[in-house]
């Protein structure tokens, strides 16, 4: 099966995503604050790196809702009475008294009622109640966010507004609104809104932002001891206020300090286990990615070799004699090997008609080429130097090349005169006389 480049890219992205999720699941710590369809708040859920039910119980999570719907207990859920999960120094599910202890009694929540959950990433509003009415001039002075309800960071911009809906002598209903959605980075945090009034009264209101908040590593944030001092936000001197339950909260803080070493020791073991699991998981994922990359490279190389082999010409095939099927239907064309011999040609092969005992066509080897037209043999002419005895001594000293060019002297013949010639000669003599 050929894997295209796009499929390789998708497989690679899937592997990277899987490794990232595994690493985040082990090294990260996630807090989920959610709400039901009808708008009611749902107890917080948080990740459990060790995936053991005993660790959920250690963090004061509900025994019935302590684990998620999966078989492994990798997600714990707080109970309704302890619906809010706080990080260090608590690191467990807590009640409302641990959250609103920094707020004065001007705006309060019902007893044992957790802070409401609101989605601040889009425009909306939420209603809350107070025991005291600000007659006029109530405004949202500032707002801040936190993950542990002890260290607060001022949030910007301030897009919250508050107005009175209705009230009576004992309870007043307010509406908190925000026209623009906030940044998604504030999801999963605890939001504190601080109000001021013209009659020098001040107070705050707490709510939880809907969404997930993930701590990048397994190390919890440093412990910050909460204070029992309430601040007057009207600009006057900040003095401690006699809030109800202050002494009881101080005792609980002291008790938490004493229980902190034991909790840290109990939480140290799952952290070590999580680090080991993270190392093994990353190693296995890296090995799997390496094996897959090697397999893909080998597959690509084999495909390239196959394509090159198909493109290469078949030079090893020999001469195949054409067969006339009409003249000799009983014979079939067979391949003959090529002969690499300087005295023969590869295109001249003798094929005998008829089959041998084995039923195969009888063939002979290549024939020598036919002789061409031969020329008539002519004996070469040999020129020799001949010396004649009658030559002068100086002719004998000439070289062989000059002697070859000497022509023999012509022979002299004596011709006898006839009778006619004699009479003619006599007449001539007489005339002369």
UniProtKB/Swiss-Prot annotation:
Tissue: Component of the acid-insoluble and acid-soluble organic matrix of the aragonitic skeleton (at protein level).
Biased composition annotated in UniProt, kind: Basic and acidic residues: 251-266
Keyword Transmembrane helix: yes
Keywords, sorted A to Z: Membrane, Signal, Transmembrane, Transmembrane helix
Location(s) in or outside the cell: Membrane
Membrane topology: Single-pass membrane protein
TM region(s), chain numbering: 275-295
Signal sequence coordinates: 1-28
Protein's name according to its UniProt entry: Uncharacterized skeletal organic matrix protein 3
Organism: Acropora millepora
């Amino acid at each position: 099966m050929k894997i295209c480049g796009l499929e390789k890219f998708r497989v690679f992205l899937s592997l990277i995503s899987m490794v990232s999720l595994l690493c985040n699941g082990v090294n990260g710590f996630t807090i989920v604050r959610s709400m039901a369809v009808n708008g009611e708040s749902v107890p917080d859920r948080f990740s459990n790196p060790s995936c053991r039910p005993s660790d959920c119980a250690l963090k004061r999570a509900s025994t019935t809702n302590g684990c998620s719907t999966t078989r492994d207990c990798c997600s714990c859920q707080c109970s309704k009475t302890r619906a809010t999960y706080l990080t260090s120094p608590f690191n467990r599910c807590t009640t409302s008294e641990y959250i609103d202890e920094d707020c004065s009694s001007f705006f309060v929540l019902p007893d044992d009622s957790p802070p409401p959950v609101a989605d601040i990433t889009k425009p909306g509003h939420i209603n809350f109640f107070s025991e005291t009415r600000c007659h006029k001039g109530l405004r949202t002075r500032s707002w801040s966010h936190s993950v542990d309800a002890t260290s607060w960071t001022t949030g910007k911009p301030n897009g919250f507004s508050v107005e009175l809906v209705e009230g009576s002598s004992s309870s007043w209903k307010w509406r908190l609104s925000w026209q623009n959605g906030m940044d998604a980075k504030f999801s999963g945090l605890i939001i504190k809104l601080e109000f001021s009034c013209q009659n020098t009264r001040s107070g705050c209101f707490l709510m939880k932002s809907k969404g997930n908040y993930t701590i990048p590593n397994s190390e919890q944030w440093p412990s910050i001891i909460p204070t029992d001092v309430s601040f007057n936000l009207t600009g006057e001197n900040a003095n401690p206020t006699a809030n109800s339950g202050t002494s009881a909260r101080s005792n609980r803080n002291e008790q938490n300090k004493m229980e902190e070493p034991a909790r840290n020791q109990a939480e140290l073991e799952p952290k070590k286990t999580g680090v080991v699991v993270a190392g093994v998981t990353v190693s296995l994922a890296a090995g799997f990615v390496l094996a897959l990359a090697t397999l893909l490279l080998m597959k690509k190389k084999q495909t390239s070799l196959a394509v090159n082999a198909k493109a290469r010409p078949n030079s090893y095939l020999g001469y195949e004699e054409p067969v006339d099927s009409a003249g000799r239907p009983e014979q079939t064309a067979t391949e003959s090997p090529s002969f690499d011999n300087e005295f023969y040609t590869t295109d001249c092969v003798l094929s005998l008609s008829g089959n041998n005992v084995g039923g195969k066509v009888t063939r002979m080897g290549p024939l020598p080429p036919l002789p061409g037209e031969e020329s008539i043999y002519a004996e070469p002419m040999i020129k020799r130097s001949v010396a004649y005895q009658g030559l002068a001594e100086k002719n004998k000293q000439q070289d062989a090349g000059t002697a070859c060019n000497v022509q023999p002297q012509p022979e002299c013949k004596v011709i006898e005169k006839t009778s006619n010639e004699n009479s003619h000669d006599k007449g001539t003599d007489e005339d002369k006389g």
